[in-house]
């Protein structure tokens, strides 16, 4: 089960990397969305003992938020949240 979850996350991540542009021009950077009303934090939980071990490992290394439309710069797509939201994560510094 863990393997299936990790494999599907990697496939979704590869798909997002292919669809996002690699570099932003100065014009695109100026019009980039700022965090605000569209961003909503949603708690995500996994059931069972295996799920909580996976959640614990992810939460140590990543900071994740649920975004309305797309992930911000520096964040990667890690699946979906409740409803139409995208789960976007970045590495903890």
Swiss-Prot record:
Residues 25-40 have a biased composition (Acidic residues). Residues 22-43 are annotated as: Disordered. Pfam families: Defensin_beta (PF00711), Defensin_propep (PF00879). May have microbicidal activities. The gene is Defa21. GO terms for cellular component: extracellular space. This is Alpha-defensin 21. Disulfide bonds join 64-89, 66-81, 71-88. Residues 20-58 form a propeptide.
